[in-house]
Every structure is written in structure tokens, then in C-alpha cells.
A protein has these predicted regions:
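Basic, glycine/lysine-rich polyanion-binding surfaces/domains
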Residues: 1-181
């Protein structure tokens, strides 16, 4: 991945889980420990059926009083429905923010030049109030910037990044053994 390239991951969507019971709700249904997720740490997790069969995977990061779930956009409606089935009487709100936020991938080297970054998988910090994290699956995949669409191009300009074809990102991902599509 070239240092000044950015990949706009248009095939990724974002759910936002918020509410008094959001942490407990997620802890009871995902495959990873939600206690690992904080303002400075994100994790990769999945949702399984009650029989243990794979349904969806996602990257979870803390955002304000809730959690972002970064997942495949084509599955987002089904994931949202599934989460609402498990919701029952939990005090949680599940919002699809895919039309308001976008996920962009940038190189690990560029990420490490940003103030407050650390070379740890899943390390999470802020860039201009937006979440930026080193990919928790493999840090060679670079960092993910979860940013409001309105601020996207201004932030890319500030970081001196130019957009690149998404296929190059997926080629790297496949070489690292992380199949995304």
C-alpha cells in the first residue's frame, strides 16, 4: 500500500449501537470480548447463530457513548434485523449510518505519522474528531478512518492523500489472507 494513497471502502457500511445497555447487549451476542473495545482499542468480531454458525463479521470501535460496527454494506440491513431480533427489552438503539459516514483505508506508514497513533493492531485514536484505527485483523492492512461524509475530502486533503482504486486494497487484503469479497 503506497504511503499517500487512500481507498474509499464504498462497500462497507456502519451501524451505530447506542443506549444504556449497549455494552451488555453486544457482550451477549458477539464472538469477542466487548471489554477489549475502548476509546483507544477496537476489535474484530462476528455474530453467529444460536447453533454457532457464522452470520456476519465486523470491526467494532467505540464512538461517543456507543459503538460503530464496520461491516459489509450488502449485509447491513440483514445484520440490523438480526440485532433487532436479539434486542428484546434491552435499552439500545441500532442505527444505520452508512449514508452519513464512510470508511476509508490508508497505509500504516501514513497512519503512524498522525499524532497520537501507535503501531498496535486495533489501536484507536481520533483524527479531527473522527475515529481512526489500525486494522485489528492485520496491521499490514493499514488504518481505517471512519469519517463523516461532509468532512471526507477536507480531511483527505489535510492528510495529503489521493484516492486509489479499491481493487488494489483488496489485492493486498487477499495476499494477507483476509478475504473481504
Amino acid at each position: 500500500m503506497k504511503n499517500n494513497n487512500v481507498y474509499i471502502l464504498e462497500d462497507r457500511g456502519l451501524l451505530y449501537i447506542n443506549g444504556d445497555d449497549s455494552k451488555k447487549f453486544l457482550q451477549n451476542i458477539i464472538t469477542n470480548d466487548i471489554n477489549k473495545v475502548s476509546e483507544s482499542s477496537s476489535c474484530f468480531s462476528a455474530l453467529l447463530t444460536p447453533q454457532g454458525k457464522y452470520l456476519y463479521d465486523f470491526i467494532i470501535s467505540k464512538h461517543k457513548s456507543g459503538y460503530f460496527l464496520d461491516c459489509e454494506k450488502e449485509n447491513i440491513e440483514n445484520l440490523c434485523k438480526q440485532l433487532n431480533i436479539y434486542k428484546l427489552r434491552s435499552k439500545v438503539e441500532i442505527l444505520n449510518l452508512s449514508n452519513e459516514f464512510v470508511v476509508a483505508a490508508l497505509s500504516r506508514e501514513k497512519y503512524l505519522n498522525i499524532d497520537g497513533s501507535k503501531d498496535l493492531e486495533g489501536y484507536t485514536s481520533k483524527f479531527r474528531d473522527d475515529t481512526i484505527l489500525l486494522d485489528p485483523r492485520n496491521k499490514e492492512l493499514g488504518a481505517r478512518l471512519i469519517i463523516n461524509l461532509e468532512k471526507l475530502y477536507l480531511s483527505l486533503k489535510k492528510l495529503e492523500l489521493k484516492t486509489e482504486k479499491i481493487e488494489n486494497y483488496y489485492d493486498l487484503s487477499h495476499k494477507l489472507g483476509i478475504v473481504q469479497k
